[in-house]
Regions:
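Thiol-based oxidoreductase modules, predominantly thioredoxin-like and allied folds used
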Residues: 33, 56-73
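Glycine-/small-residue-rich active-site loops that bind phosphorylated ligands and cofactors
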Residues: 39-40, 68, 97
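N-terminal leader/targeting and pre-domain segments
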Residues: 1-29, 115
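Conserved residues at beta->alpha junctions
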Residues: 35, 64, 100-103
């Protein structure tokens, strides 16, 4: 689990409200929703860390175990069809695209997030 924390160290920890704000304001932003206790999230975080190191992309992280975010996150996940973690969310022009696939390759991550 320490490796997970190391893998997400270059991500910007944020809240569900920030993701909704990006949608509402038609920003372009990418979010990783996950938790350190999820083996699939740990796998995805390792691949994502390599992409971030290579591209210097700004990716946001929403901790799905953050007690203060549970209600908001549940509503957000329900509203936008994010059934499981890891949830990889890319927002552009008020549209949201979601992938929940821990086996995404580095190239798939880059393609999905437009990196």
């Amino acid at each position: 689990m320490e490796q997970f924390l190391d893998n997400i160290k270059d991500l910007e920890v944020t809240t569900v409200a920030r993701a909704q704000e990006a949608l509402d304001n038609k920003e372009t932003a990418t979010f990783f929703i996950g938790r350190k206790t999820c083996p699939y999230c740990r796998k995805f975080a390792g691949t994502l860390a390599g992409v971030v190191a290579e591209t210097k992309a700004n990716i946001y992280f929403i901790n799905s175990e953050e007690p203060s975010q549970l209600k908001e996150l549940q509503e957000f996940r329900s509203r936008y069809g994010i059934p499981t973690v890891p949830g990889f969310v890319h927002i552009a022009d008020g549209q949201i695209n979601v992938r929940c696939d821990s086996s995404m390759s580095a190239q798939e991550i880059k393609d999905f997030a437009g990196l």
